[in-house]
Amino acid sequence: MRPWGRCGNPCAFAKFHAVPRSQSAGLLLYRRSPHGLEVFLVHPGGPFWAKKDLGAWSIPKGEIEPDEDPLAAAQREFEEETGFQISGEFRPLAPLKQKSGKTVYAWAVEGDCDPSGLKSNTVSLEWPPHSGRQQEFPEVDRAAWFPLDEAKRKILPGQVGFIEWLERATR
């Protein structure tokens, strides 16, 4: 299964095909625990997501800047949203199309970090709507490690395929 056509390389594929703004990149960080594999997910901040849990979490990800290497974008976004720098062997996953039409490129990487050290960047938005008042909210308000079965319930439905890939690849 080579989702990238003949090149077999997601970075080359994305560069060759001029990545539009409707694409983002992220990292699926995983670790091995005594209870099996766990994945690191983040919960979006802000008032819209405050009371949402199941189907609301995500891999740390964000938009790819013009002329930016997709893997570099994934690493940058991970650090911006969590405060953590991740290194290791980045394994490309097949891109997934979200309900919004956005395509998400992702890489799986084994590693570890402590969610209690989360340091997210912030976003400004008008809140309450039509109030004319801008407020700052963390882009990510929390992070956690989840066993794969629980992660599949927590993560946005359009990203479940990343966890399913990890299950198959690590059997």
Which residues does each predicted region cover?
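Aromatic (phenylalanine/tyrosine) cluster motif
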Residues: 13-16
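N-terminal strand-loop-strand
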Residues: 18-58, 107
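Short, charged/polar surface micro-motifs in flexible loops or helix N-caps
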Residues: 34-36, 46-49, 65-66, 100-101, ...
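The catalytic Nudix box helix
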Residues: 58-93, 147
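Active-site-adjacent beta-strand/loop module that shapes the phosphate/pyrophosphate-binding cleft
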Residues: 95-132, 144, 166
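Charged phosphate-binding loop/patch that engages nucleotide di/tri-phosphates or the phosphate backbone
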Residues: 148-171
